[in-house]
Regions:
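Generic hydrophobic/aromatic pocket-lining and core-packing "Φ" positions
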Residues: 5, 58-59, 81-84
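Conserved P-loop NTPase nucleotide-binding/switch module
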Residues: 65-67, 71-124, 129
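Fold-independent oxyanion-binding glycine-rich loops
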Residues: 4, 24-27, 51, 74, ...
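Switch/connector loops and helix/strand junctions flanking conserved nucleotide-binding motifs
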Residues: 30-33, 104-107, 133-136
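Short glycine/serine/threonine-rich phosphate/pyrophosphate-binding segments
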Residues: 1-2, 32, 78-80
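Glycine-rich phosphate-binding P-loop
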Residues: 1-12
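Conserved P-loop NTPase
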Residues: 122-143
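P-loop NTPase switch/communication element
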Residues: 12-61
Length: 143
């Protein structure tokens, strides 16, 4: 999530212009903020809202910070789902993570299932751990 955030925020030379990003970091796992200062490099156009419920943080960001992209990890509650739908209706893009061993596992959560079935997401990336530090990455376009 940190690398994705930094690349969206800074941009990628000749490929992607940097965008205004707000990270909703409910438990400080992405930014590792200490006394309000990010300890991880999340990019030059990144603001962080931490120590607040994700759904509330998303709405605060949209109303007062003009993000082009919201980033949050471990989504899955009804409040998260409603906030994500609100963000998309406001034209804000998002990068979100959810835990599960497979798409079928993630779809057991009714809120995530609803977001996927409603085609709120353009793309789903599944990262499966394979023996130690090896990973298998599967990408699925939704729309």
């Amino acid at each position: 999530m940190r690398d994705i955030t930094r690349n969206i925020s800074n941009g990628i030379l000749n490929k992607l212009q940097g965008l205004n990003v707000v990270v909703i970091d409910e438990r400080g796992e992405i930014s590792s903020s200490y006394r309000g200062v990010m300890q991880n490099d999340l990019g030059i156009r990144t603001d962080v809202i931490n120590d607040i419920q994700k759904s509330i943080g998303m709405k605060i960001a949209i109303r007062s910070m003009a993000p082009q992209v919201l980033i949050a990890d471990e989504i899955g509650s009804e409040d998260d789902s409603e906030a994500i739908k609100y963000a998309m209706c406001c034209g804000v893009k998002g990068v979100f993570s959810a835990h599960g061993n497979s798409l079928e596992d993630v779809m057991k959560n009714p809120e995530l299932k609803g977001l996927i079935q409603d085609k709120i997401f353009e793309k789903i990336i599944i990262i499966k751990s394979r023996h130690g530090s090896n990973y298998e990455i599967e990408t699925m376009n939704i729309n």
